[in-house]
């Protein structure tokens, strides 16, 4: 499901790479864990898989390059610090992501998760008005809403 080939990422050309020549395969139906000490490149690898960083190498998700909408619909990433559009309401954020990922029935799917996460009363709030915990819940709702084959939480 996720295939990483020869991933190399340098943040500064004068320093050693954060990740050098990493290859891995995470198969469908399996739980894959990146384990290592601080500074080993775990977060850099995950952010590269999620296509949040520029890198060298190749990353495929469900057979698609990780920068394609097809790949993004297969894999959801919930970052430690939620990355939301502060000027959008919860409902507007849901609509934006639902349309961007071409999710059929995204409103109905989101409604189920909003109820499950006890977020229905926050629908009209701007993302910047939400507490850190509520922002994290919204990030998870967005990740679940696209119904991917894999998650990174």
Mark where each language-model region is.
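A short, flexible loop at the N-terminus of ABC-type nucleotide-binding domains that lies
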Residues: 1-4, 8-21, 28
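Walker A (P-loop) phosphate-binding loop of ABC-type ATPase nucleotide-binding domains
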Residues: 36-41
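Helix-to-loop junction immediately C-terminal to a conserved catalytic motif
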Residues: 50
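Conserved ABC transporter NBD signature motif
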Residues: 57-73
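Conserved ABC ATPase "signature" region
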Residues: 95, 99-122
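Conserved ABC ATPase signature
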Residues: 126-133
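Hydrophobic anchor residue at the start of the ABC signature
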Residues: 140
